Regions:
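A generic structural signal for short coil/turn motifs at secondary-structure boundaries
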Residues: 63-67
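Surface-exposed, flexible loop/turn segments at secondary-structure boundaries
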Residues: 19, 101, 122
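A structural signal for short, well-ordered beta-strand segments and their strand-loop junctions
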Residues: 13, 55, 114-116
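Residue-level marker for buried hydrophobic side chains located in beta-strands
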Residues: 54-56, 94
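Zn-dependent metallo-beta-lactamase
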Residues: 1-53, 60-62
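Active-site metal-binding motif and surrounding structural segment of the metallo-beta-lactamase
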Residues: 70-116
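Short loop/turn segments at strand-loop or loop-helix junctions that form parts
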Residues: 57-59, 119
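Metallo-beta-lactamase
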Residues: 2-4, 74-85, 89, 119-147
Length: 147
C-alpha cells in the first residue's frame, strides 16, 4: 500500500533567542579570528500541512538558558503561537543533532513522534562524551530523554 505524500507545505522559521555578546571562539574550536564578535540568532523550524505539523529542532528552554547563562526571548514551544500552533498539536519532531540549542525542549512536545539519526544517538552516548570540549554543547538530561 502506497502512502500519499502531502504536496502543500508551509515552512516557518521562528526565532526564540539571540546572543550578541559572543566571539568567534564561542562557535569554533580553532579560529584565527577568535576574538571577533559573532552574534547568533536561535530558531526552530516548523513545517505545516493539512495533516501534519513537524518541528525541526526544539531549541532550548528557560531552564537551559539559566543553566548556560544564555539569553532567551521566549520558549520555542511558545513561539509556535505566532503561527497558531500549539505544542500539543505537533505530530513529529526532527532533531538534527543533540546539542542543547537543538534538543533542549523535547518535553514540550508530548504528542510528537521523534526522529533522530541513529549515528547521532551513538555519538551522543559514546566515548567522545568523555572529552570536555566535545561534550560541552550536549546536556545529559536531553540525551537521556531521547534514549
Amino acid at each position: 500500500m502506497e502512502t500519499a505524500i502531502e504536496k502543500n507545505w508551509e515552512v516557518y522559521a521562528l526565532k526564540y533567542a539571540e546572543r550578541v555578546d559572543r566571539t568567534r571562539s564561542d562557535s569554533f574550536i580553532f579560529d584565527d579570528h577568535s576574538h571577533q564578535g559573532h552574534t547568533i540568532d536561535y530558531f526552530i523550524w516548523v513545517l505545516k500541512s493539512k495533516k501534519d505539523i513537524i518541528v525541526v529542532d526544539t531549541g532550548y528552554d528557560y531552564d537551559e538558558a539559566k543553566r548556560r547563562d544564555r539569553p532567551i526571548q521566549r520558549a520555542p514551544s511558545e513561539a509556535l503561537k505566532a503561527i497558531n500552533v500549539e505544542a500539543n498539536d505537533v505530530t513529529d519532531v526532527i532533531i538534527t543533532h543533540l546539542h542543547y540549542d537543538h534538543a533542549g525542549g523535547l518535553k514540550d512536545f508530548p504528542n510528537a513522534k521523534f526522529h533522530l539519526q541513529e549515528t547521532e544517538m551513538a555519538y551522543a552516548t559514546g566515548p567522545c562524551m568523555c572529552h570536555e570540549t566535545i561534550k560541552m554543547p550536549f546536556t545529559g538530561e536531553h540525551v537521556c530523554e531521547m534514549v
